Amino acid sequence: MSEKTFLVEIGTEELPPKALRSLAESFAANFTAELDNAGLAHGTVQWFAAPRRLALKVANLAEAQPDREIEKRGPAIAQAFDAEGKPSKAAEGWARGCGITVDQAERLTTDKGEWLLYRAHVKGESTEALLPNMVATSLAKLPIPKLMRWGASDVHFVRPVHTVTLLLGDKVIPATILGIQSDRVIRGHRFMGEPEFTIDNADQYPEILRERGKVIADYEERKAKIKADAEEAARKIGGNADLSESLLEEVASLVEWPVVLTAKFEEKFLAVPAEALVYTMKGDQKYFPVYANDGKLLPNFIFVANIESKDPQQIISGNEKVVRPRLADAEFFFNTDRKKRLEDNLPRLQTVLFQQQLGTLRDKTDRIQALAGWIAEQIGADVNHATRAGLLSKCDLMTNMVFEFTDTQGVMGMHYARHDGEAEDVAVALNEQYQPRFAGDDLPSNPVACALAIADKMDTLAGIFGIGQHPKGDKDPFALRRAALGVLRIIVEKNLNLDLQTLTEEAVRLYGDKLTNANVVDDVIDFMLGRFRAWYQDEGYTVDTIQAVLARRPTRPADFDARMKAVSHFRTLEAAAALAAANKRVSNILAKSDEVLSDRVNASTLKEPEEIKLAMQVVVLRDKLEPYFAEGRYQDALVELAELREPVDAFFDKVMVMVDDKELRLNRLTMLEKLRELFLRVADISLLQ
């Protein structure tokens, strides 16, 4: 069977840059699935994406589905005919479904009996006939949150469509996709190359688009070119470009023919905190900032034009003129804000609502101040500095700079606090209170910052859960999942001696009578333990290991982490599987018994050597392991408990627990309960699979 290259290109208006990669990757994944489901043999499916096009190129696509031999077994002969040999309704219905009559069916004989059988040779459908629907289906499944309609048509897509190119080899596949009749016309760059041209063969793509249309359709190639050219441009001025992945992706999605240029701004603007300048360059203008080798911002930036100009200096000057007013604004705001102390913004916090039922930002500030001081006392941080940081924590939200450049919240608080002469750990805490902002982000660097970051997040968690507005489905407007995970990460990775129970109770107490949810403390803790489950699954821990620890509901995050590591290590021991099974057996035995057990085992009642030996070892280990549990040495404790495998196995092999002798039965049940309690000091080992 011959093979050909298939090309589909959808020419559109400018596509959303932040969604371009996901649209192209989904298009490729959807179409690959369509090919596989149709049984069409094919080679590599390569995707292309530029601001005004999505395209796929499929190598070695078979021209038709393979022919198939199908068999459909019908009713058994005994059920297919009545006593007179007439076909039953079941046989006739089956035959109708196969498109034949009963007398046309074959018979299949096996050692288990005889059945009606339908065999057929199904010729594979041509690829040409299948492709239009496959393309349409793949496009319909794209992850587009908001569709748009254009003109008088009822067609919906992410952006208006102008061209649809469908080529199988050198042949146009006739189809109407998204309201456009397919042909071999492709549009080039808006301002360079040929605005429109025809493509003779799918194999010519994307080279023909580069040569005649001045468009680099390969997304990864454009991105790599921008990165390499920007690095070289920065090197030429003795610096390093800030090529953050997210901005690099966005810029690659904005240009069809990237031309990297270097511009500059006035050095006087370097007196403004670098974060504000960078926010303007990256966020507003999509420029790449440039840093010196010592990490200081240089008065230069790198940008990407979408055109080759005969006079690039004109483009450079234009961009310099555009950015200058923005930098001047930042300079003005910075100088204006510093004319008063950060603390002077406190009264204005009373004018901003945190949440309708929970009060203003000033109310939140008072709670954070108190909670940060309480946390600082628990973890050995400077209480005065923590409460000071809490008092100032939201003041920068009232500054001109943060009002204009919202992403500078926190960092501007740090700069203004330093200007006011606040303690360094207080200033740093104002910046780091929002950390970690995302998975893998840095944690607060000092104890005061940790106290403030935890206080801010716990106040939000307690308040929102306290009025019954916990996250539902994908909706989490107050970012409570991120807040909970942030608290857990700080406590675990900084090894802080904090208990979620008392921490949550204190956060709730500070709200006074504002909260309406009577179960708020338990709800917050359960929610945070649920975040633990997700965290440890991402870390590669098995679900049953997590469940074994969660069953004990440890509310000290550092303690939870120690238990997780201990159970994970325990699973590597030879005795683990047997002891997990034994714990499950003990758990089941105890669950079925409703008898009241004694507080201790009566040694004089024990009879069998196996139970005497096990009872003695349980007593010895109970005393030996008490300091282990007190110190959180759970891994060492489980290693010691692994030594119980042999006596536990011997006990269950030789000793009957549920005997008629009540005193003996209760004594044995008590011993098993004491055995299980030892393991439960760490986790519920019976849940391990």
Curated annotation (Swiss-Prot):
E.C. number: 6.1.1.14
Family assignment from sequence similarity: Belongs to the class-II aminoacyl-tRNA synthetase family.
A cellular-component GO term for this protein: cytosol
UniProt protein name: Glycine--tRNA ligase beta subunit
Organism superkingdom: Bacteria
Cytoplasm among keywords: yes
HAMAP family: Gly_tRNA_synth_beta (MF_00255)
Organism: Shigella flexneri
Cellular localization per UniProt: Cytoplasm
Chemical reaction(s) catalysed: tRNA(Gly) + glycine + ATP = glycyl-tRNA(Gly) + AMP + diphosphate
Subunit field text: Tetramer of two alpha and two beta subunits.
NCBIfam families recorded: glyS
UniProt keyword terms in alphabetical order: Aminoacyl-tRNA synthetase, ATP-binding, Cytoplasm, Ligase, Nucleotide-binding, Protein biosynthesis
An annotated Gene Ontology molecular function: glycine-tRNA ligase activity
One of the GO BP terms on file: glycyl-tRNA aminoacylation
EC category: ligase
Recorded name of the encoding gene: glyS
